[in-house]
């Protein structure tokens, strides 16, 4: 069982790292680059990004990480006091209560609004202005929470030790 929890924690740490990196890219340069375009070109570009992200390669990592974190949170509670259980619970919950719901409840609805507009319309320009004002802030939050979740999961792994070496 220790080996299974270790591997699941490693996969969750890798998942949160990949997601934090993806979110970090948006926070540090992608949204700035899109903001430098005209509203029409920015909308077209972001609509293309939104369409591309709805593919299995991203969705498996995003939802797979959430499932792993839910399982790991339960495992940490069931085996409370075991090496790494505190970090494991904290990291799993931080992703489940931070990056995951922020994405689903804030960023995705904003994406949906943006994909529904015609890029060269007044409504499109209005939605783009609101999108830029709020999407980035929510993205910063999910970036930080995914990164901190990753760090906590790595600390859990360090505290668990390598069960394959025993």
Task: Explain the meaning of each model-derived region.
Residues 2-16, 77-97:
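Interfacial segments of alpha-helical transmembrane regions
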Residues 28, 46-50, 67-79, 102, ...:
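Membrane-helix exit/interface motif
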Residues 155-166:
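Juxtamembrane boundary at the C-terminal end of a transmembrane helix
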């Amino acid at each position: 069982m220790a080996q299974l929890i270790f591997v699941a924690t490693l996969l969750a740490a890798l998942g949160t790292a990949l997601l934090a990196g993806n979110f970090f890219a948006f926070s540090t340069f992608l949204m700035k680059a899109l903001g430098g375009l005209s509203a029409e070109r920015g909308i077209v570009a972001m609509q293309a990004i939104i369409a591309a992200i709805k593919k299995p390669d991203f969705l498996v990592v995003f939802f797979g990480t959430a499932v792993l974190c839910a399982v790991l949170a339960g495992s940490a509670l069931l085996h409370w006091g075991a090496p790494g259980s505190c970090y494991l619970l904290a990291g799993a919950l931080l992703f489940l209560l931070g990056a995951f719901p922020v994405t689903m409840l804030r960023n995705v609805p904003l994406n949906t609004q943006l994909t529904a507009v015609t890029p060269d319309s007044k409504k499109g320009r209005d939605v783009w202005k609101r999108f830029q004002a709020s999407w980035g802030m929510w993205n910063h939050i999910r970036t930080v929470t995914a990164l901190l979740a990753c760090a906590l999961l790595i600390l859990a792994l360090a505290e668990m030790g390598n069960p394959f070496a025993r």
